[in-house]
């Protein structure tokens, strides 16, 4: 090309959750059946959408308006419905004008980070959902700035570590919180959220809280939303329907803007997000039309309770299978539908492996992992020997070696097999 055309931030873009699929497809050619535990798509894992939800959507499809553009921020009726849900919680109060729809939260995340001044940093949790960490690092053109989630303390944020990293890095202007958390399944107590808000207030920061899993909370944990604790701090809550209905293929998410009137700089920032959406015209109309009718339906609360009971059962089974393994730190997931497992360092020697029967497949895998992290080696050995596809924990912006696995499998017998096999192969890997 006449000139260099690649932005310096492009090197920071990574999404192992999908990238591993290419390797898995190659492994399928060796006759291995793949069990996909790498991505959080409940529908792909066999979850059935209730008929009453399908009936609502089918009726909307017959309405010609569902094929038209909608207002740039989203349908007014839907935004009013969602604003009312926030206001019922008694914390910060918003209007429909404080909500903007996007084509999935991936779209929202790209704009949220992409419209920040390049020198500004948003500190991410570690581990962190890779869409956030990659987008933030790409915007800045340098690796993510992170704070530690402690696997020895239920994956809760280390607040002292967070404060130090804010205090000694003046570029940090925002804090990312993911609650319930992906990839760990942690659900944060109100006390921790209050402490994060206090830090944001003290250092004059804004908060981004990804709450896409906010209605997937179980094991007796209580849901606490940012809107309940944010007080006068500026913030954005990210929500959507991909995981909750679930309707991931709709690509429908939104941001709720809190306290934009409290800071002129933050107000201009959210105005820039809106203007970026103006250029795109709007987000998809049909799923927006469905939201009030589905979430306001008499069956919806019961439906959420049923889903949470299912994931609670899965969480407890998975934890029981893995918690007593030597060399493993396992925490019970209490929200979302993922579990993250950590390998203790003193069990890792650089030569850990899992036996692969097919010599040609073994040769292929060992070529793939020649310079890989230890946990990526585990993931690829596991994939080749069993067909189970999980994601290395280091791909979630973490220094910890381990993996993330979903709790989505609907078939009880197969779910038991997945976690029995994981336990067996973890033991083999850590003892070689």
Swiss-Prot record:
Its EC number is 2.6.1.-. Its cofactor is pyridoxal 5'-phosphate. One of its GO terms (molecular function) is transaminase activity. It holds the Pfam family Aminotran_1_2. The keyword Transferase applies. The keyword Cytoplasm applies. The modification N6-(pyridoxal phosphate)lysine is found at residue 243. Its main location: cytoplasm. Keywords: Aminotransferase, Cytoplasm, Pyridoxal phosphate, Transferase. It is found in: Cytoplasm. One of its GO terms (cellular component) is cytoplasm. InterPro entries: Ala_Aminotransferase, Aminotransferase_I/II_large, PyrdxlP-dep_Trfase, PyrdxlP-dep_Trfase_major, PyrdxlP-dep_Trfase_small. GO terms for biological process: biosynthetic process. It is an enzyme of class 2 (transferase). Belongs to the class-II pyridoxal-phosphate-dependent aminotransferase family. NCBIfam families: PRK06855.1. This is Uncharacterized aminotransferase MJ1479. It comes from Methanocaldococcus jannaschii (strain ATCC 43067 / DSM 2661 / JAL-1 / JCM 10045 / NBRC 100440). The lineage of its organism: Archaea, Methanobacteriati, Methanobacteriota, Methanomada group, Methanococci.
